[in-house]
Swiss-Prot record:
InterPro entries: Znf_C2HC_C3H, ZNF_C2HC_dom_1C. GO terms for molecular function: zinc ion binding. It comes from the Eukaryota. It comes from Rattus norvegicus (Rat). Zn(2+) 2 binds at C491, C494, H506, C510. Residues 36-48, 301-312 have a biased composition (Polar residues). Residues 23-48, 85-107, 145-171, 292-316, 330-349, 356-379 are annotated as: Disordered. This is Zinc finger C2HC domain-containing protein 1C. Belongs to the ZC2HC1 family. Residues 23-34 have a biased composition (Basic and acidic residues).
Length: 525
């Protein structure tokens, strides 16, 4: 055991190769010092070490396969490892006796001069991670970046021992330095994932935009449909309003036509007299101007009637009738101003009847004084109401007025209404109608006496207040006279005054009380 030499301590950053053959060669290269020795102990330790490393390698491979099967997203890691593992195929160890420091370190180097970081085709490399509790495999945590500050001299020393760049340590595959301290550039790793995320975002945005456009088109179609419906409704309402207006105009036109038929014969007679009086007042120049204007209006109206529709004709007829009515009303006002008898001439025959004929005979403009005198003589008074009427109307009024004055309102008898349908009704009918009670004479108004007595009481109360304020005795003042009310009745037994109805109840009671015999005296025992 004294001559036993332990194997140099392996560094933590040893990377196991992908192929088992390479691993076997590596292990054999590692354990050359033990095999060269002739002692059986060294050979047994070497075999144990190799078997242990083989078991460890198989376990790590199984774990990696499980991770890949459970998380398909990590296939990228296998790709990166396949790209990177061939570079570590030719691993050798410095076996010279002079370079003892190299054997003590036990560092492995690549057989080919590969750079420290892989090329651009290794962008998809993502290092493996061991299973941990509480870590989501689908959404791994963001790795922690711990950059080591290696000097250029150290790297040069490590790399110049064999002239080859150093392999990365196994700590670079640890969970604390996930992804960013690996052989692959992190910006190159993030680019495909970012592209996928951006493509997915663009796809979702495009679908949302398409949905919004479809919704907008559907809204526009709905708005157009509603606009069409509203326009149709407006057209229907406009047509209905126009139809109603036409019906109204036709009704007005028919009414005016009927009025024109009724008024036309009267107006012909009246217009003849009015035209003569009106033209006599006008000068010849004005008369010719008015005649030419009326003639032009008639010609234009005839042309309009020929070329226009029935509705336009009705409008023209309405305007013409209105103008004629205004002329008639002006003529009536002028006739009233000229004389009172003209008003009787313009009254309609339906209202006056025979009276209009009698008044029209005496209603000539030349006999205005005689007509007023005859009207005064014909007036007579009604015997019932005392109003004055014409002799022609007085008889009719007197008959109606006599009926109104003679008819009295039937008084409602509540006792008969209650007794109706009972045996008491026969008794009331046999008894006959109740005799009307004699109405009491009307009372005389005594408001002045009441007012004077009220003023006297107020003055007496004011005097009493003044005496009390001075500190005197109010009993020294003369007593106020009792208020004299002539309506009140004095009781003969107690000499008090009561209202008439109250006195009727009080006097018999007071009489019985006063006429009672005195109570018997009590004999004291």
């Amino acid at each position: 055991m004294a001559g036993l030499q332990l194997a140099p301590h392996l560094p933590v950053g040893v990377m196991f190769p992908h192929n088992k053959t390479e691993a076997h060669g590596l292990h054999s290269a590692k354990h050359d010092p033990y095999e060269q020795s002739d002692s059986p102990q060294r050979s047994s330790m070497g075999h144990l070490r190799t078997s242990f490393q083989q078991k460890l390698w198989s376990n790590t491979e199984l774990e990696q396969e499980d991770v890949i099967s459970t998380h398909p997203k990590r296939n990228i890691c296998t790709k990166a490892r396949r790209h990177s593992c061939p570079h570590s195929a030719g691993i050798s160890q410095q076996g010279s006796g002079n370079n003892a420091q190299g054997q003590g370190k036990g560092l492995f180097y690549l057989s080919s001069p590969t750079p420290r970081y892989p090329k651009a085709n290794d962008q998809d490399f993502i290092p493996f991670r061991k299973k941990r509790v509480g870590v989501d495999r689908a959404y791994p945590l963001k790795p922690m970046v711990h950059r080591k500050s290696h000097s250029t001299s150290e790297t040069g020393i490590d790399g110049d021992q064999n002239g080859y760049p150093r392999l990365p340590d196994s700590s670079e595959f640890s969970d604390s330095s996930f992804g960013l301290r690996s052989w692959v550039n992190p910006s190159l790793l993030a680019s495909p994932q970012a592209e996928k995320v951006m493509a997915q975002l663009h796809r979702t945005e495009w679908t949302q935009i398409q949905r919004l456009e479809a919704a907008g088109e559907s809204l526009q179609k709905e708005i157009r449909r509603k606009e069409i419906l509203l326009r149709e409704k407006l057209k229907k309402t406009e047509e209905g309003l126009r139809r109603i207006q036409r019906e109204k105009k036709q009704a007005i036109f028919q009414e005016d036509r009927e009025l024109q038929r009724m008024v036309l014969p009267r107006r012909r007679v009246r217009d003849g007299d009015l035209d003569t009086t009106h033209n006599s007042c006008l000068s010849p120049e004005l008369r010719s101007e008015v005649f030419s204007r009326n003639r032009g209006e008639d010609q234009t109206c005839e042309q309009a009637q020929e070329n226009s529709s029935p509705l336009q004709l009705s409008d023209y007829e309405i305007q013409r009738l209105k103008r004629e009515r205004l002329m008639v009303s002006n003529n009536k006002i002028r006739d009233r101003d000229s004389g009172p008898s003209a008003g009787t001439f313009s009254q309609p025959a339906e209202d006056l009847g025979d009276e209009l004929q009698a008044s029209s005979l005496s209603g000539t403009p030349g006999s205005s004084g005689s007509s007023s005198s005859t009207e005064e003589q014909e007036l007579g008074k009604c015997s019932h109401c005392g109003r004055s009427f014409l002799s022609l109307r007085l008889q009719r009024h007197s008959t109606v007025c006599g009926k109104m004055q003679g008819s009295k309102r039937k008084v409602f008898d509540s006792s008969r209404a209650r007794a109706k349908g009972t045996e008491l009704e026969q008794y009331l009918n046999w008894r006959g109608p109740a005799t009307d009670k004699a109405e009491p004479p009307p009372r005389k108004s005594t408001w002045r006496q009441k007012h004077e007595s009220f003023i006297r009481t107020l003055r007496h109360a004011r005097q009493v207040q003044q005496v009390i304020a001075r500190g005197g005795n109010p009993s020294d003042l003369p007593s106020i006279l009792p208020a004299e009310n002539p309506d009140y009745v004095q009781c003969p037994h107690c000499s008090r005054h009561f209202a008439p109805k109250v006195a009727e109840r009080h006097i018999p009671k007071c009489k019985t009380i006063k006429n009672r015999p005195p109570p018997p005296r009590r004999h004291d025992s």
